[in-house]
Regions:
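Metal-dependent nuclease catalytic core centered on acidic motifs
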Residues: 85-198, 207-226, 230-235
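Short, non-transmembrane alpha-helical segments in secretory-pathway proteins
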Residues: 21-47, 96-108
Length: 235
């Protein structure tokens, strides 16, 4: 309650323009934490706060009991009380990524995928326990649009079958970069990075010596898989 009162006072000062000095970093942290805790009834940690030249503030946040569930939180305008966040979208992304890995496991492969969902619009009243099919059906053009790793050599046809199975079960399309890593040490190092940040760039993946790179696209059960050579060229 004390935290909420302090945050409200700081917000009022900012909106009223009572101070010529920008709010300090810890004030932005408190404002975002209070917003998230009131909205989701959970404790959160906010870090990496950056004030942008356009008057917005961007931060990274995660639940206090799950440091791997990292998401973006934004104050669009420091002179207004609004805060936006990607918490539910990120949590749903983790669930879809885990569901894709579960199907991969049925085909005999260990894998790990990032948690990024792209959509024109997402189900507005979803929470982190919303049914996966329901979420996809009530979102517009939603896809699991991210990168991931597979441990062991895999054929393009197998990836295509996994993508089809995923779409048929969850009604969610995919657009994936898949890095095939056969060295177990490199695979587990990449897996730890993905677990911590929920994403893997091509430059980061290159440090783990992928044997193959595949691009997987599946929409409305029309699935294509192409092999990429790491320089933007595909087979």
């Amino acid at each position: 309650m004390i935290k909420k009162i302090i945050a409200m006072c700081l917000c009022c000062i900012s909106v009223a323009g009572c101070s010529a000095m920008p709010m300090r970093r810890d004030a932005y942290v408190l404002r975002i934490e209070t917003y998230l805790e009131d909205k989701y009834n959970e404790d959160f940690v906010v870090s990496k706060v950056q004030r942008r030249t356009d008057g917005s503030v961007h931060a990274i946040a995660y639940p206090a009991d799950d440091s791997n569930a990292v998401f973006d939180a934004v104050i669009p305008d420091v002179n207004k009380p609004d805060v936006s966040d990607e918490y539910i979208k990120t949590m749903m992304g983790h669930r879809y990524a885990n569901a894709f890995s579960e199907i991969m496991h049925k085909y005999g492969y260990d894998s790990k995928f990032g948690a990024l969902i792209w959509a024109d619009s997402v189900m507005p009243d979803a929470d982190k326990t919303t049914d996966l099919q329901e979420y996809a059906d009530n979102s517009e053009n939603a896809k699991l649009n991210t990168s991931g790793i597979v441990n062991g050599h895999i054929a393009a046809d197998t990836l295509q079958n996994v993508a089809k199975d995923f779409y048929n079960k969850y009604h969610m399309g995919v657009s994936l970069f898949v890095y095939v890593i056969t060295d177990s040490g490199d695979y587990h190092s990449a897996e730890r990075l993905l677990s911590s940040y929920g994403r893997l760039t091509m430059a980061e993946a290159a440090t783990y010596n992928p044997d193959d790179i595949f691009i997987v696209n599946c929409d409305n059960n029309r699935c294509q898989v192409r092999k990429e050579d790491g320089y933007g060229n595909t087979d």
